Regions:
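Conserved beta-strand in the GNAT
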Residues: 42-43
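A generic structural signal for short beta-strands and their flanking turns/coil linkers
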Residues: 22-24, 49-51, 69-73, 84-92, ...
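A short, Trp-centered hydrophobic/proline-enriched beta-strand micro-motif
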Residues: 19-33, 73-77
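General beta-strand recognition
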Residues: 27, 52-54, 135
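Charged, gly/pro-rich active-site loop segments
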Residues: 2-8, 88-147
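A short mixed-secondary-structure module that forms the rim of ligand-binding clefts
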Residues: 46-83
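Active-site-proximal "nucleotidyltransferase
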Residues: 2-27
Length: 147
C-alpha cells in the first residue's frame, strides 16, 4: 500500500487511469450553442497516452460542430458493482483531428462499418481529449484532483 493510500482513501492517479482503461463505455460531454451540456455514450477510447484520450466519430456529427465551436469537454467512466459504484469524471478540452497520420494510427479493422470509404473517408475523424482535472466517486466519497 502506498503512503498516500494509507493516509486517505482516495484513488491514486495510476488507479484512476487503470480504472478508466478497464471500462468498455465512455460518456463524452460537449457544450451546445445555447451553453447547455450534451452527453453521449461512446465506445471506450481507442488509445490513451497519459491524460490524452483518442476517440473516433463522424466528421459530420453534431458533436464535432460543438467541439469546433467550444472545445470545453468532459468524459465520464463508471462501474456499478453489486455493492459498490465507482465513477471518474475528467474535465478538459477536445480537439478534432483530421490529419491522415492520426486517422491511420487510430483506425481499427472493422471501422468500415461506420466509415464506408475507409481510413480516408472524409466523414471519419479523431477526437483528442486532453484531461486537466477531474472528480472521482468511490465508497460514498467524492474527491477532486488535478492532472
Amino acid at each position: 500500500m502506498t503512503e498516500s493510500r494509507k493516509r486517505s482513501n482516495k484513488m491514486t492517479t495510476k488507479e484512476i487511469f487503470d480504472f478508466v482503461d478497464s471500462q468498455k463505455t465512455a460518456f463524452i460531454g460537449s457544450v451546445d450553442e445555447d451553453g447547455f451540456p450534451n452527453i453521449k455514450a461512446m465506445l471506450a477510447p481507442r488509445e490513451r497516452d497519459g491524460n490524452i484520450f483518442y476517440f473516433t466519430t463522424n466528421t459530420s456529427s453534431m458533436r464535432v460542430k460543438q467541439y469546433l465551436s467550444n472545445p470545453k469537454a468532459s468524459i465520464y467512466f463508471y462501474h456499478r458493482g453489486r455493492f459498490r459504484y465507482t465513477g471518474v469524471m475528467l474535465k478538459g478540452t477536445m480537439s478534432v483531428l483530421t490529419d491522415q497520420e492520426t486517422k491511420e494510427r487510430i483506425w481499427r479493422t472493422g471501422d468500415t462499418m461506420f466509415y464506408k470509404k475507409g481510413v480516408t473517408d472524409p466523414d471519419y475523424c479523431v477526437l483528442r481529449f486532453t484531461a486537466a482535472s477531474g472528480r472521482c466517486y468511490q465508497d460514498l466519497k467524492t474527491e477532486s484532483f488535478e492532472l
